[in-house]
């Protein structure tokens, strides 16, 4: 990025902060603050500052309007002395539990081949799965959901009962959300019952409990058999034979078991027939792959992590880091809703070295090689991404 481009973006970021209304996170005085400047010698991180250090006793917006940083962060950690120059001197008191979703970590997404819009849409799907796991399985409410301004989302849990979790405990939560280390037999509840049922006495009844990963598999299994029980027999058998190791005989046995034991199946009993157990085991793999959330593990386990400030601008896109209400997530379009109003309504001249396409505010802009006049928000995005530089007016 050349000097003219840097100075232009720095100035316009400052204009944004003069207009913006920013609210610091809870316990702002207990957190470390940091920011990245628009320096010409690479990335320069300024950190180990307290809230008082950065604001000088004033407000956060005034500091940002004056400093005009490229990126702004605060710590998940809370400290006795957040401005101390080393982590050991800060006196750790606890940390928010933070989850990060980024398109780079989504399975099947290649950032070099996937459009920015498609990556963000895929990330929103992963966010929905993450929130379901956090709320339904852990009971983590309230949650703070934030669009990162880049290619993903952050979720903050600030309840008192998570603040003092150490890295090991946070890693266990990560593994659960990722579905790592899960085995089907671990989620099945085993109960001794009277009789032998063809096995050693007493027999064992294996059941998928309601809730958690077991509950998800149970729901999928019940849905499957509800589906096949409404089909013609030939179609139902074909559907069941789609599962590995289920041939004609086992498919018929599973279908018969489902007809005769529908109530038990609904209760999660996977021992109504060995074929049903085999199908449930395979569904487990499918459910974990489909309903886990590909979070970035180091973000959650790092109790000292710096995370982006809502209301600030992302220096790699020019988009706003935005707090989202849970009921607004489905309708949220980051390529429209996160475009700062500061950059709307003006045209600027930019120079593009290679042709590229930018999609913002519901429109697609084809930038040809050379100098062109574009809406400022398009130019800011292209310059921040490194696609273009500022041309002379």
Swiss-Prot record:
NCBIfam families assigned: PRK00419.1-1
Family, as annotated: Belongs to the eukaryotic-type primase small subunit family.
Function (record text): Catalytic subunit of DNA primase, an RNA polymerase that catalyzes the synthesis of short RNA molecules used as primers for DNA polymerase during DNA replication. The small subunit contains the primase catalytic core and has DNA synthesis activity on its own. Binding to the large subunit stabilizes and modulates the activity, increasing the rate of DNA synthesis while decreasing the length of the DNA fragments, and conferring RNA synthesis capability. The DNA polymerase activity may enable DNA primase to also catalyze primer extension after primer synthesis. May also play a role in DNA repair.
HAMAP family, sorted: DNA_primase_sml_arc
Any one of the GO CC terms: DNA-directed RNA polymerase complex
Organism field: Natronomonas pharaonis (strain ATCC 35678 / DSM 2160 / CIP 103997 / JCM 8858 / NBRC 14720 / NCIMB 2260 / Gabara) (Halobacterium pharaonis)
EC number(s) given by UniProt: 2.7.7.-
Subunit composition and interactions: Heterodimer of a small subunit (PriS) and a large subunit (PriL).
Lineage: Archaea, Methanobacteriati, Methanobacteriota, Stenosarchaea group, Halobacteria
Cofactor needs: Mg(2+); Mn(2+)
Gene: priS
Protein name per UniProt: DNA primase small subunit PriS
Domain of life: Archaea
UniProt keywords, alphabetically: DNA replication, DNA-directed RNA polymerase, Magnesium, Manganese, Metal-binding, Nucleotidyltransferase, Primosome, Transcription, Transferase
InterPro entries named among the record's database cross-references: DNA_primase_S (IPR002755), DNA_primase_ssu_euk/arc (IPR014052), DNA_primase_ssu_PriS (IPR023639)
Gene Ontology BP annotations: DNA replication, synthesis of primer
One Pfam family linked to the record: DNA_primase_S
